[in-house]
Each structure stands twice: as C-alpha cells, then as structure tokens.
Amino acid sequence: MGHRTRTFVEQGPRNKRVAALQTGGRMAGFVERTRVTKHREAYSARRQKNDPTRSSFRSSSPVVRPFSSKGRARRISGLMMALALLCFSPLPPRSTAQSAVRPYPPQPSAAALRWADEQLARMSLEEKIGQLIHIGLNASFLNQESDAFRALRRQVEENHVGGIILFRGPVYESVHLMNRLQSFARVPLLVSADLEAGAGMRFEDTINFPWNMAVAASGNPDYARRQGEVTAREARALGVHLIFAPVADVNNNPANPVINVRSYGEDPKTVARFVVAFIEGAQRGGVIATAKHFPGHGDTAIDSHRGLPVINVGRDRLESIELIPFRAAISAGVGAIMPGHISLPQLDPTVITPLPREQVIRPIYAEEGSEIVVEKATLPATLSFAITGRLLRGELGFRGLVVTDALDMSGLTLYFTQDEAAVRAVEAGADMLLKPADPEACIRGLREAVRAGRLSARRIEESARRILAAKYDLGLVQNRLTPLDMIDRIVAGREAERLADEIAQRAITLVRDDAKLVPLRAGQTLRIFNLAITNGEDRLWVARPFTAELAKGARVETAVLDERSSEEEVRKALDRATQAEVVIASLYGRVRSGQANSVGIPKAGERALRAVLGVKPVIGISFGNPYLLQSFPELKTYLVAYGDMPSLQRAAARALLGQAEIVGRLPISLPGLYARGTGIQLRKAERAAGDDVQRASPR
C-alpha cells in the first residue's frame, strides 16, 4: 500500500495546517520537547510535594536541561527563530481542550453519520479496513528518526490504523507522542486506555482510584458516578477518548484470578447499579465508556491472558446473573462493549483445537511457560457470531461499538493466527480489533477475506461507519490535539485526590475482630511488627504508604517478603515478629494479569504467616484479594482494603489507629465464613469510647 496523495478528510486550509504541523522542522520539535521538559518537571515537583512517600527512583527518567551556560546566546537566538516560525506558520488544528468537551451521546448524531458517510465515499478498501485496527503502544519519547517512531508513523500513514491503545507511560511524553501521531493521520486517531481505576492505571505520577470492589464496599453508587466523571475529564486532558471501563463482570467465583476486585461484587443487581453510575459519569465527561467482558468473565478460574476460560452454563443462568449488568449498561446508553475471550459451549458449541506450537505467537502478557491449553475448547465470545452477533447485537439490541479484547492474549493466540482471528471477529460482529500482535497480518486477512467473498465490503463499511461517527461525536474532526497546559490544570488535582481518599475511607471493611485488636489503643507504647507479603516485584516500596501513615500514631517495624525471599529472610522476619506485641500481616495478593501467582501470596510469606498465627496477636489486612481469609481462617482479626492504592493503604492505617470510622461492607461472600454485606461498623464516637460494636447484619 503506497502513500496516497488524495485527501478525503479535510480540504483546503486544513491540509496546510496539518502539513505545517508535520513539517515544522527540528527547531519546532526542540521547542515542543523543551515545553514537555518544563511541564514534566513542574508536574513531578507538585506530585512529590503532595505525596512525600514517593521515591525518586520511581519517577520518570532524569531530565537533561535544554540550556547550559556554553552557547546560551546561540541557543536563545535559535529558540526565538523557532518561536517566530511557529507564530507565523499556518495554525495546526485547535486542540480538544481549547473548546468545551461535550458529553458523549447515547446514539450517533445525524451530523456524525453524514460526515462518516462522506468519508466512506472517498475511502479505499484498505483505508476502511485500517479504521478497524487499534494498535498498542507503551508511550515514551521517540526521536523522529528512530526505527520505533518510523514504524508507528508507517502504521498511521500507510496502514491507516483507526486508533491506538496506550499502556504504561509518562504523562507528557504520552500526550506529546499522540499529538505527533495525530498530525500524521488523515482521519483523527481514536485513542484509548484501560482506566478502570483512573488515570493512574496507565499514566505515571497520576492518581489511582480504588478498585471497583472497594467502591461497591462503600455502598454508594454516586462514588462510581463521580469517579467516572473525573476519570473522563482527566482522560480528555491526556488525549484519551475511549476508556475500557467499567468492568461489568459479576465476580461469583472466589477462585477467579483475573477479575476479583476489578468487579463491583457478586450480586448482579448491585453490579448493574454501579456500572450504570460509572457509565453516566464517564460519558457525561466526554469519553466513550466500555462495559466488559461480555457476556461475563466473573465465573472463571482461568485468566484469559494465559488461556481460554470455559463457562459451561446455559442461557437461563446467564439471564439471572451475568447478563443483568450488560442489559443495564445498554439501557444506559453505553458507547462500547468488549466481548471477552471466554468459551461458552452451551451458547456456541463450535469446537476449536490448539495451533501447532510453532505457529503460536508468544503472548507478552503471560509468564514463560505459564499458558494453559485446553485441548478441545469452543469458540470464544470474541469470535462467536452466536454470542456477539445474535445475542449482543440481535437480542440485546446493542448498536454501539463492539471492541475485541486484546488480540495478543493467549485466550486467542493459542488457537488462532492473527489474520484468522481478525476475520472471525469481524464475522462475529466486532468493529474494533484491539492490540493485534501483527497488525499487518490482520489487515491482510481482512483484505483477502473481502476479495474471496468471505466478508463483504459492506460489512467492513458498517464497522468503519460506527468508528467514524464516534470520532465526530467526540469532537475529533474539529479538535484532535491535546495542549500540555491542560494536564497541569486537570490531571491529578485536588478533586481526584479527595475523591480517592473519600472512597477509600468508606471502603475499609472490618470482617472479623474476635481478638478485639481494632483500633490499636496503645499508641506509641505498643510494639508493632508489620509483616508485608507481596506477590509483585515491588518489595522496596509496596508497603510505604501504609507504614508512613501508621508511623504517625504508632511505633512500627516492617519486613517485606516476596517469592524471591530466602529462608534467612523468613527467619529474620519471624525473629522480629516474636519480639512484637502485635503483628500486622499486610497481604498484597493482587490481581496480576497473566501471572501464575495472581491474587495469591508467595510460599515464603505463607510459611511466615502460619508460623506467627497462634503465637502472637495478628491483624490481617488484605490489600488486594478479599478471599484470602479462606486460606488463613485462623486470623482472628481481618480487614479488607481491596487494593494497594496509596489512598487505600492510608485509609487502612487510619482505621487501625482509630482516627477514622470503619463502615465498609463486603460486596462478596466468603464461602463458609461470611455472607455478602458483612462488616463490623465502628463509628468515631464508638471507637473513642471503646464500646463493643456488634457485626451488622448483611444488607
């Protein structure tokens, strides 16, 4: 596919503005990089001031300052010339934040459909196919002469990709890179990101909201609505238009390794209320929200990043549990739905078999050798017309964007080549093909399927039309660029911090306190040992927010154990534990997609905890998987924080110290132990007086 000279998006002066943006020269690039540097330094300083527990080694790369004493006058002269060039060159398209971002409508506007039809009339088949492709990118600064940047530019200019999903990266570099790629695109790029827990999930030095299960533990759907709106505003300030949130899965399987705290809980009606609230807030804030993972990923024991989960239930069961939140989301006007890589043999019994090993694309999500291969599986929802086409599009009447889960996950790559997966997904009813491992193979597969008559050109146009209309209604035709100064005013501001802290404090759940250890009453006189156990590679900083807050009211020592901890480290931790009066077991068993130890804790930590139980008073706190009490039923005091976000860790410390009330309730049951809705309520007055408070009945 050669580069076409024909212009089909905008004519006349608009082309000159884009051309000016593309060819502003090295000095213009120097000016922009200087702005990025200045903004990044100011932003990092502000974040460091607001959160003193942050360590310097976790911040973005060291900044090379653009000016030195030598040659200063020469550089200033060059800078002034560059500024003059920018001032008198034709203006680039206005940025999104320079005009008000409108709420995203529940249905495409008439103007959007007209514009989409005008563009389709001018597009080649290759250009229409390109709109369906949504490539993945870890954003960072890329020199314009680098191979990586050239490859990205080629995807935009030659493959005509319709969008980009952003993964982890620094704030300013991410926005700067998206602006550069937007300037190369004939049709504005649709930029997306997984922002289930706010901007902090994908952008460094920004704020993570508590996981959905923590939001539900508060009992207040308005928190979900406010979180959705703040997330949307921050997303637009970061150049993101489509967010893959909320999770609409009902987590009714305690062994689920990938959904867990990402869900609002196990009750489908409760999940539906919170899902709808988040969608309303997010789309009011000007982004497309995405309900995922249709028709429900909550009752699985396999992570679809590692293999293909099977849910062997019939339609009646789905109607009574899994489909309830998705029906509610559709009624609320959700803009997008993501089918999951989930096998449902009672809905689609089409048998599939694994590819020969040499044909399997190495999944970047899964640990080496950790893939789970089901020898005889059935077609996943992502590629099933019976599930996506007949059920979602037909019976449920969904008319928005259908976005596949990532095409490079083992749930697909173990069974399908990329070109075949792309064709089957479009046959099933998908519009956007998310994060293919081989975009060229997907494009080639779709093109050949049309030429062979397997897919019609009209079917490609259907999806391209939906995508183009969405871009119009997002305001991207008029405003595709994002100004850096909006980041300083909007992202990681006081509103987001306050909301995260408020949700966190209302979420902390005291499930059990048979030992009457909460709150800790002895203050600085009590010797406390914090045994932190993590399933991540973050031992140097994982417990810092908790210990820093706890140290304000108690004397505490901490040791961190992970899967690499030696027997000597375990022994030293136990020695320190025996010298303490109270041991806090901080359990960081978090969702770790694609990892074999997701939601669990490592063996070394498990051995240490079992050795302490029964010897010392132990307060267990789960900063992740709430079901861990089932593995350690001997814990006489157990709190759930539902995640390791700094706001949740600080809230847990304040709750232990008696500085804040405890009002959260379990959104899930702990089978054999506690029912959904359990939560010992400790109000401020009661805590100060030391009154005994009985466990409240489940709501």
Describe each model-derived feature in a short phrase.
Residues 38, 49-50:
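Polybasic, lysine-rich low-complexity intrinsically disordered segments
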Residues 97-154, 384, 394, 414-699:
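Preference for extracellular/luminal or secreted protein segments
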Residues 150-167, 229-242:
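Catalytic domains of carbohydrate-active enzymes, especially glycoside hydrolases
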Residues 53, 57, 63-80:
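Bacterial N-terminal signal peptides that target proteins for export
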Residues 138-141, 191-201, 241-251, 291-297, ...:
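Short glycine-enriched loops at secondary-structure junctions
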Residues 121-124, 164, 173-189, 193, ...:
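Second-shell residues forming the walls of enzyme active-site clefts
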Residues 8, 30, 43, 56-57, ...:
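Aromatic (phenylalanine/tyrosine) cluster motif
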Residues 78-90:
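Bacterial N-terminal signal peptides
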